[in-house]
Each structure stands twice: as C-alpha cells, then as structure tokens.
Amino acid sequence: MDTITNLITSIKNAYMVKKQTVRVNATRINENFGRILLQEGFIRNIREHKDGQKFFLIFTLKYRKRGEKIITLKRISRPGWRIYSDFPKIPKVLGGMGIVILFTSQGIMTDREARKKKIGGELLCFVW
C-alpha cells in the first residue's frame, strides 16, 4: 500500500472506531498532507513522536458535538491509475466547500493554491 492510501485508510478507520488520535509513519508526504488538513480545519493537531529509532506523526482528530466525524476522504489517483489535471480543469468539491489535495511540481497543495499558482498536478484525494 502506498503512503497516501495508508494515511487515508488510517484516518478513516480511526473515525469509524471514534479514536482521538492516529499514529502514522513520519514521512515528508504525510507531514505535508497533515499540514494541509490542519490548515483547512479538518484535524485538531499534529505532533511528532519518536519510538526507539522510528519517527511517527500523531494526528489529533476533530469531531462534531455529537461525536460525528468532521471529515470525509476519498482517494482519487492510485499507484495503478494516476489521474492528472491542468489547473483550469481541477474539480471543485461540493461547490467549493471541500478541497482537492494535489501533488504538483511544487509539492503537495490544495486546489485553491494550485489555481492561484496556475499549476496542475496529480489529484490525490477529495476532502469534505
């Protein structure tokens, strides 16, 4: 399983069992992905944790008042089926209420940032 799919699956599974935190391997991709989720308000906090020689990222999840999840993630591009988009054709999620996370030549960013910089890239996932 690739890094992004592993991260998305970990977050989805944690929400299903109502966990407060998710622990994932500390990679640059996971860190940038988490930073975007934090900036957009989909998660509460990110912190680094060292267990022996391995580094992990711990994401603190956000819930609504009644314990409902606040985030839905849908993987778009996969290792066997890459999906790319030019900046004018980047889709909008729920009419702009959600975000698209892209992998571009300038790193991982949201659809809004990519449109502002006028660059396209690989569509990693939809978040709403």
Curated annotation (Swiss-Prot):
It is found in: Plastid, Chloroplast. The keyword Ribonucleoprotein applies. The keyword rRNA-binding applies. GO terms for molecular function: rRNA binding; structural constituent of ribosome. GO terms for cellular component: chloroplast; ribonucleoprotein complex; ribosome. Belongs to the universal ribosomal protein uS8 family. This is Small ribosomal subunit protein uS8c.
